[in-house]
Amino acid sequence: MNVLIIGKGGREHTLAWKAAQSSLVENVFAAPGNDGMAASAQLVNIEESDHAGLVSFAKQNQVGLTIVGPEVPLIEGLVDEFEKAGLHVFGPSKAAAIIEGSKQFAKDLMKKYDIPTAEYETFTSFDEAKAYVQEKGAPIVIKADGLAAGKGVTVAMTEEEAIACLHDFLEDEKFGDASASVVIEEYLSGEEFSLMAFVKGEKVYPMVIAQDHKRAFDGDKGPNTGGMGAYSPVPQISEETVRHAVETIVKPAAKAMVQEGRSFTGVLYAGLMLTENGSKVIEFNARFGDPETQVVLPRMESDLVQVLLDLLDDKEVDLRWKDTAAVSVVLASEGYPESYAKGTPIGSLAAETEQVVVFHAGTKAEGGEFVTNGGRVANVTAFDETFEAARDRVYKAVDEIFKPGLFFRKDIGARALKAAQK
């Protein structure tokens, strides 16, 4: 069978790498992919926004399964177009992807169906939003309602910071229509974790959890990013906590979507905070997390393609996991997530052993080596029997391949290390 992966980042490289290991698969195509994933997939020069081009390619190349990586094509209805053409595709419809496409929709859904989340209000008026912030005080969280590539959330530690953010979003329209409406919610403190599940309708098959690192710099400082690293398992989150989150959050959310006439097929990603009052939802995403996928899929023992086909065909899904640890560190371009240069030479990025894989995100091949072509450049991922060993291994590999013009966080997994030492 031929498989098509849509997207071009580190998550898509991981999906292609995992799909290529399947005994069911003859060819893996990636559209548009990136130069660094050429060992796992044949690159197809079609942008993820070219829906007609993608459908036509899938038909002409006997693609038996398409996996959509990024959120934008999902929210723009790419899955609906594949289904209309009679093609097997894994991902939510446009109607279901709204759970990520609109923060307000997701919050209202949780309120209606009693799914635990932070208290919130939604605003389109700067003056009303400002008055609310002054009434509530800081710390407080402000989110653009629509998509902003993981950069539409501000955790404001002071009222001044909150009001400046509201000004950016509502007055200066920093993200255009995406920030014309904002959700302001209470600040939650605790231990964060990402719980992804394969979902079809009310059927929910949870994956192992991961922890992501959103802030740009060590010690959780600096602006929010798409994610600077991740690890799995998360020793400070108990199995009981995860089970409880599946029963009280993920399953009810899947059921709620069915009841709303927006039945969800795909990966439902719950970004959760374990607070003193149990797990609460920070956000829902309608796809595989990035960089969480880079540590979760390497721990999957099952054949990913078989899992997705069985799920789509309403068969029993055989989901098994390895009892190993994975740690991934993002190499990013200096200046990310603000402005950064492209075209910086970064060598071969070769650190591949059986226990280290480099998943490429923003890279381009030029003259036999790679140059930077994005904010997040690559995910260096290591696996080992224990978390500590995987973490040591990943940082050794990062030191080997690091080049000027890049930066990375040196404290990925520090919280888990602390928990393991207790």
Swiss-Prot record:
Keyword Metal-binding appears in the UniProt entry = yes
Name of the featured protein: Phosphoribosylamine--glycine ligase
User: For ATP, which residues are the binding ones?
Assistant: 133-194
Gene3D superfamilies, per the entry: 3.40.50.20, ATP-grasp fold, A domain, ATP-grasp fold, B domain, Phosphoribosylglycinamide synthetase, C-terminal domain
As to how many cofactors bind and how, the note says: Binds 1 Mg(2+) or Mn(2+) ion per subunit.
So what EC number does this one have? 6.3.4.13
Query: Catalytic activity, per the record?
Result: 5-phospho-beta-D-ribosylamine + glycine + ATP = N(1)-(5-phospho-beta-D-ribosyl)glycinamide + ADP + phosphate + H(+)
The encoding gene is: purD
For biological process, the GO terms are: 'de novo' IMP biosynthetic process; purine nucleobase biosynthetic process
What's one Pfam family the UniProt record gives for this protein? GARS_N
Which species does this protein come from?
Bacillus subtilis (strain 168)
**Chain residues that bind Mg(2+):** E283, N285
